[in-house]
Amino acid sequence: MRLTAKQVTWLKVSLHLAGLLPFLWLVWAINHGGLGADPVKDIQHFTGRTALKFLLATLLITPLARYAKQPLLIRTRRLLGLWCFAWATLHLTSYALLELGVNNLALLGKELITRPYLTLGIISWVILLALAFTSTQAMQRKLGKHWQQLHNFVYLVAILAPIHYLWSVKIISPQPLIYAGLAVLLLALRYKKLRSLFNRLRKQVHNKLSV
């Protein structure tokens, strides 16, 4: 049985709650000693993992809609993507304000350049910013064919974000490996599309170098 438009609306409400409830829990944990011995790191990892969860959920929608024959599921993809960006922004903000501190924000640029895992993180965030800004139907019409080209960069984020997570932890634990494995699996489901994009990019580069 296919989902109806009304059911998808309620699904969207549930997804909004899924994006909001972790934030409410985090606020509670900060104020009631619910974090560990290093609360700053706990906040950074929690916000980063939540952003990664929404990224993986966003990537899951298209194959799930196709294989489950639920085309209306596509309507939830933008919502999940925006929550991914929101949590990624909280992740970046927690690093800038809690790790560096308000008085040391001038160091942020240097940190992002000199620490490779931070470089991957900021590249991912900038891409998510561009995708969030252009996620409306109005921007889709305005950009035309370039809209899809831009939004294909989500696959690059799906590669960079798990590497950023793996690189940021001092001791490799199962959790970042699981996220990386899920990202690889979701990208593998798009093997044909990714191969087509790679061949097209290689052809464009070859043509420019041949001029």
From Swiss-Prot:
Q: Which GO terms describe its molecular function?
A: electron transfer activity; FMN binding; heme binding; metal ion binding; oxidoreductase activity, acting on diphenols and related substances as donors
Protein topology in the membrane:
Multi-pass membrane protein
Recorded hits in InterPro entries, A to Z, give: Fe3_Rdtase_TM_dom, MsrQ-like
Return the Pfam families for the record.
Answer: Ferric_reduct
Which residue ranges run through the membrane? Answer: 17-37, 82-102, 116-136, 153-173
Instruction: Give any single GO term for biological process.
Output: protein repair
Please, which domain of life does this record's source organism belong to?
Answer: Bacteria
The cofactor binding remark recorded in the entry reads: Binds 1 FMN per subunit.
Q: Which prosthetic group or cofactor does it need? A: FMN; heme b
Cellular localisation: Cell inner membrane
Q: Please provide the record's keywords in A-Z order.
A: Cell inner membrane, Cell membrane, Electron transport, Flavoprotein, FMN, Heme, Iron, Membrane, Metal-binding, Transmembrane, Transmembrane helix, Transport
Q: List cellular component terms (GO).
A: plasma membrane
Q: Which family does it belong to?
A: Belongs to the MsrQ family.
The free-text function statement in the UniProt record for this protein reads: Part of the MsrPQ system that repairs oxidized periplasmic proteins containing methionine sulfoxide residues (Met-O), using respiratory chain electrons. Thus protects these proteins from oxidative-stress damage caused by reactive species of oxygen and chlorine generated by the host defense mechanisms. MsrPQ is essential for the maintenance of envelope integrity under bleach stress, rescuing a wide series of structurally unrelated periplasmic proteins from methionine oxidation, including the primary periplasmic chaperone SurA and the lipoprotein Pal.
> How does it associate, per the subunit comment?
Heterodimer of a catalytic subunit (MsrP) and a heme-binding subunit (MsrQ).
**NCBIfam families, alphabetically?**
PRK05419.1-1, PRK05419.1-2, PRK05419.1-4
The name under which this protein is listed is Protein-methionine-sulfoxide reductase heme-binding subunit MsrQ
Supply the gene name.
msrQ
